[in-house]
Design a protein with these regions (language model features):
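Bacterial Sec-dependent N-terminal signal peptides
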Residues: 1-22
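Acidic/histidine-rich helix-loop elements
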Residues: 31-51
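Short catalytic/ligand-binding loop motif for oxyanion handling, primarily in non-cytosolic enzymes
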Residues: 33-36, 78-83, 130-135, 261-264
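N-terminal post-signal-peptidase region of extra-cytosolic proteins
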Residues: 49-59
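Proline-aspartate-enriched helix->loop->beta-strand connector
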Residues: 66-72
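Short, well-ordered beta-to-alpha junction loops that form the rim of enzyme active sites
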Residues: 72-77, 125-128, 182, 256-258
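Hydrophobic, often amphipathic alpha-helical segments used for membrane interaction and targeting
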Residues: 82-85, 92-243
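A cross-kingdom marker for long, charged
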Residues: 221-286
Length: 286
């Protein structure tokens, strides 16, 4: 009922329609802390004085965009934790856990929220399909139960990444070329690194070897299913974003792993009430 009321207010409000679309920017990032990615994108000296100065430069650029909400790649069940991190940071207390401090949610999202005097900090919108035991326990309906069983059975067919690359030479080449470039970016400033990562070529390559590449050789005869599962995950992420938007929001920032950016942009670019803004234009001072 709450979402229905919101949609009515947002998409039927004549004042909103006259005032223009909501701007939304997707900032693709390397996962600074722990992540399940095949290759970690960490920068080992992130907490050094020089790197922290570079982080502040990025935050200062994002401040100029003035997002009303900041969305981050963690699941909604972790929202209370990050609310606590934000409250502590407002009082000058950094996270005790290294994995939390060494994380783009804190380093960019929380720091940006503080600069903007946001009341709630960041909003968690990630979606991860739960495993069989958890998924069947928390299922709200038959569809949830069926999706849990479907995901479980599909994952049993998923090859290792090494096997995936062995069977898909074009994906392997795209991945190797990307990693070669990526390693060279580690010598750049954080801003330069993000500008490279969010370039059109980088985002499209990430989309290819993370999502659509599964279909090239119909991996294990389930190529389309692996690709569809990635689209489903991103659709759930977008649903979480849309469900968190209020009629008063004018600008939104999504800080998320680079592999998600292309599909999320594609899903929103035809939406009549949203305007996708290039994150690199923001980093380049609009």
């Amino acid at each position: 009922m709450k979402n229905l009321i919101f949609l009515f207010l947002l998409f039927s409000n004549a004042t909103f329609a006259q005032s223009g679309r909501i701007q939304i920017a997707f900032l693709g990032v390397f996962h600074m802390g722990e992540s399940p990615d095949y290759k970690q994108g960490s920068i080992t000296d992130l907490l050094s004085a020089e790197r922290q100065k570079q982080i502040q430069e990025v935050v200062d650029d994002l401040v100029k965009f003035k997002p009303d909400k900041i969305f981050v790649e963690n699941t909604p069940d972790t929202q209370p934790y990050w609310n606590g991190v934000y409250r502590n940071y407002l009082n000058g207390i950094k996270p005790n856990e290294k994995s939390s401090e060494y994380n783009e949610i804190f380093q960019i999202g929380i720091k940006l929220a503080k600069k903007l005097n946001h009341p709630i900090g960041v909003t968690c919108v990630n979606f991860v399909q739960p495993d069989l035991v958890v998924g069947t326990r928390i299922a709200r309906n038959k569809v949830d139960t069926l999706m849990t069983f479907y995901s479980h059975e599909l994952e049993l067919k998923r090859p290792s990444y090494d096997d995936y690359f062995l069977r898909n030479p074009s994906v392997k080449k795209a991945f190797d070329d990307y990693i070669t470039n990526y390693e060279s970016w580690k010598n750049l400033t954080i801003k330069e690194h993000l500008l490279n990562l969010n370039s059109e070529k980088s985002i499209s390559t990430l989309h290819y070897f993370n999502i659509t590449g599964w279909m090239d050789t119909n991996t294990n005869s389930f190529g389309a299913e692996f690709t569809a599962k990635e689209y489903y995950r991103n659709a759930k992420i977008l649903q979480n974003i849309l469900s968190s938007v209020s009629p008063f929001d004018r600008k939104l920032l999504v800080i998320i792993g680079g592999g998600h950016v292309q599909v999320l942009k594609d899903m929103l670019k035809t939406h009549p009430y949203f305007e996708v803004v290039d994150a690199n234009k923001i980093l380049n001072d609009l």
